[in-house]
Amino acid sequence: GSGKSTFATLLSHSHGFVHLEADSHFMTNGKYTFDPLRAADAHAVVVRDAFSAMQAGRKVVVANTHVRLWEMSGIVGATQLAGRTLCFVECAANWGNIHDVPQAALDAMRARWEPLPAEFRAIAFRLTANSDE
């Protein structure tokens, strides 16, 4: 509901980024069904695919929920190995819950949330559903 997938889709369609996210591994026939036993594998596939795309010279956007800072380590490592530049975007909008994640799960993630340290924040901007804003 923070706008991660929406923002990643925009970058993919408008600027040619490869859009990756662990949530895509939990979609079956258009329905999102999270399986915590497959979460680590889904994130590992995203890191692998991001690294491959970066090695091929592609721009990559990863729309994952990294609740704890250490959860970004795979993407950070892949970016460093590929010799690419990394930019973090912290989405804070309310775009609705497109994956129907239970409210209790969202509340638990918010309670564990570690915001990006100030040194990782390059810019702040607002992305809205209305293209006139």
What would you call each of these model-derived segments?
Residues T6-A56, A92-N97:
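Conserved substrate/cofactor phosphate-moiety recognition/catalytic segment
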